[in-house]
Amino acid sequence: MSKQYVLDSWALLALLQGEEPAAARVKEILLEGERQQAALLISIVNLGEVYYRVGRRSSRATAVDTLNQIRSLSLTIISASDEMMLAAADLKLEYAISYADAFAAALADHTGATLVSGDPEFDQLQSRIKVEKLHRTLK
């Protein structure tokens, strides 16, 4: 498999909330993963971010259901190892990004994968990692 994507929480939240055109692109990427045309990765830290954001908007029960749905996807969840923690912390030292975003960026940097997000914090990292910038229509 030559294509690899790291999904940031922004991408999954856009899908869950039906924010187009980002949601359609995330669906396409997930389909590529299901068809084994691409490897799909997410940091456990970013998965936790999806969980708490869904829980805040809805309920803990909805967040648990969402987490179970995400775990059923063709998506490899990467733990926060010492190596990833240090890589994320080094990115946080160098760039003005959130700590959770630093984990997504560190994973993309480590694997050479394309980071999929609409978060503008990643704009400053485009010389270092590949970023597929998602967009949503403003309401």
Identify the function of each model-found stretch.
Residues L12, L47, F122-D123:
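A generic structural signal for short hydrophobic patches within well-formed alpha-helices
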Residues E34, R71, D109:
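Anion (oxyanion) recognition and catalysis
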Residues S2-Q4, A105-K139:
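Acidic, PIN/NYN-like endoribonuclease modules and their adjacent C-terminal/linker elements
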Residues M1-I42, G55-N68, L138-K139:
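Short, well-structured N-terminal submotif of metal-dependent ribonuclease cores
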Residues T76-V116:
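Active-site neighborhoods of divalent-metal-dependent phosphate/nucleic-acid chemistry enzymes
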Residues D8, D101, D119:
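Acidic active-site catalytic centers that drive phospho-/nucleotidyl reactions
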Residues R53-V54, S74:
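Helix-loop "lid/cap" segments that line or gate small-molecule binding pockets
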